[in-house]
C-alpha cells in the first residue's frame, strides 16, 4: 500500500459494494484521502454514519462529493488534486438496461468518457475502469455499453502520456448490491422457495475482496491501455442455489426455475479468442495489452503480424468448475454470509 501513502483516491459510484470494500481495506492504511463521488445523497449519508460509527479515528479521511459521471463539470469539480481513480460508477442490471439502453449509454459510455477526459485534464496519475465479463461477446445493452466503455478507455490511453488507464473485467461478485445470493437468503428467511433462472447456466464467481485485489493488481502491474482479468472459478446456478440452501436451511426441493431473464447468456466469457491470442499469463491473472497499431495497414502487410498465442476463449464453461462443497466453502467465507448466519443464530 506504499503507493497510496498520503495520496488522494477518488471512487466513482463509491457508495456501492466495491466502494465499501475499498474503504474497509484502505481506511486504516496511510492513504491521505478517499473521495466518494456519486449522485445519491442518501447513500452517502448512510455511508458517512456507518464509517463514523465503526472507524471514528479514520473516518475523516473520507470526503463526499455529490455529482453524476454524466455531467463533465461535476466530475471535474470533484477531481482537482486527485492522484488515482477507481471508476466503478455504472448501470449494471442487465434487464433494466435492456428496457432503458440509452440510460446505460449515458452512464457507462458517456460517463466513462467524462471521467477519463477530466482525469487527463487534471493530471491524474492512474485510472482503473471496472468492467464486466458481459463486455466479451456482448448480447445485451449492459454488456454492449461496457464493451464500448473499454474501447473508450483504450482510445483515451493512446492520447495520454501522463495518465495510465487500465480496465479490469469481473465475473459475478458474490453478495454485491443487486446480486442473487442476498435475494435467496431473504427468500429462505421468509419461507419462500428459492427462484433461479436456469439451473445449468454457469457464472464466474468472486468475492468483493478478490474484486479489490484485481483492481490493485491492475494498478500495480498494468500498463497504459491494458485489460486485466482474474482466473476466476465458476459454478452452475443450481450448485450456487443448493449451497445457499445448505448454509441457511432452505429446502432444495423448493427451488423454482423461472426462466432466463432479458439479455442473459447461458455462460459468460472473461477473455475472447481474439484477446487470448494476445494475453500475457501472470499467474492468477491475464493481462491483455492494447492494440496500438495505427490505421496505416500497408506496413503490416509488409512486416507481417505479431506472434500470437494459441489460447482459446476463457469462459465460465471451460474454467475450473466448483462442485457443491467447494462452492459452499467459498460462499461461507464471505463476511456478508457470516453476518447473516450470526443473525440467524441470535434469533
Identify the role of each PLM range.
Residues 87, 91-151, 155:
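Conserved Rossmann-fold NAD(P)-dependent oxidoreductase catalytic core, especially the SDR/UDP-sugar
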Residues 12, 79-88, 129:
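Rossmann-fold scaffold of SDR-type NAD(P)-dependent oxidoreductases
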Residues 38, 65-66, 106, 198, ...:
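Conserved residues in the N-terminal Rossmann fold of short-chain dehydrogenase/reductase
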Residues 3, 151-175, 179-347:
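Strand-loop microenvironment adjacent to phosphate/nucleotide-handling motifs in alpha/beta enzyme folds
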Residues 64, 104, 127, 165-168:
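Hydrophobic/aromatic anchor residues within beta-strands of the central parallel beta-sheet
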Residues 30-43:
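Conserved glycine-rich Rossmann-like NAD(P)H-binding loop of the short-chain dehydrogenase/reductase
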Residues 7-29:
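N-terminal Rossmann NAD(P)H-binding glycine-rich loop of SDR-like oxidoreductase domains
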Residues 63-84:
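Conserved Rossmann-fold cofactor-binding substructure of NAD(P)-dependent oxidoreductases
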